[in-house]
Amino acid sequence: MGTLLEWLSEGDLTTDGRANEVAELVASSPQLFPDLIAALSFSEPAVRGHAADALEKIARNHPEWVLDYLPALRRAAIADPVAMVRWHLAMVFGHLAGFGETQGPSCQTLERLLHDRSATVRSWALTSLCIIGRLSPNRSPLITRQISALTRDPSAAVRKRARRALETLTNSGLPFPKGWAKGKKVLSEV
């Protein structure tokens, strides 16, 4: 875990640090994936933030790697005091949307994140819920009700994203908003 931890330690929470390089390293050496997951529990906030960033990037192309860790990631998404960790994990749940068995647990966590103190976390939580709702129309009515409350959010950015999500969920003919779904598996399905 030496090199991985060194790279994750570089920079602070205002930067991505070396998360891109960590993501490339772990993607090319999958045996390091458990070490990346372990870094989410490290005491240093920047390490956890950069680990979550790298994990999100890996989950775009390898969402199946994350499945065994879903319970721990759900706990971290709710409990970690670092907003960067919470928003990247909210994004990961969107990458998992193509795996039907993850949708219920992911929705429960994302619903809680809709009330997060960070506007960025709320924004990515509603985005991932929108992805799930688009892929699973049976979940869409409940998700639509939850997201509609965010059209009155204190953050203008969250209000705007909530309105766009509602349009996307209620009009299947609309293309999915560019930049919202970043994972290969999800992009092919929304």
Locations of the language-model features?
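Amphipathic alpha-helical scaffolding segments comprising HEAT/armadillo-like alpha-solenoid repeats
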Residues: 1-5, 29-40, 63-76, 101-113, ...
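N-terminal alpha-helical scaffold/docking segments in eukaryotic complex subunits
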Residues: 1-48, 167-171, 182-190
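Alpha-solenoid HEAT/ARM repeat scaffold
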Residues: 5, 16-20, 34, 49-52, ...
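Alpha-solenoid HEAT/Armadillo repeat architecture
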Residues: 9-12, 27, 41, 59-60, ...
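Alpha-helix N-cap/helix-start positions at coil->helix boundaries
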Residues: 13-16, 45-46, 79, 83-84, ...
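A glycine-rich, hydrophobic loop/mini-helix early in the fold
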Residues: 42-76, 80
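Structural signature of alpha-helical solenoid repeat scaffolds
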Residues: 56, 94, 130-131, 167
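Hydrophobic secondary-structure block in the mid-to-C-terminal portion of proteins
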Residues: 131-190
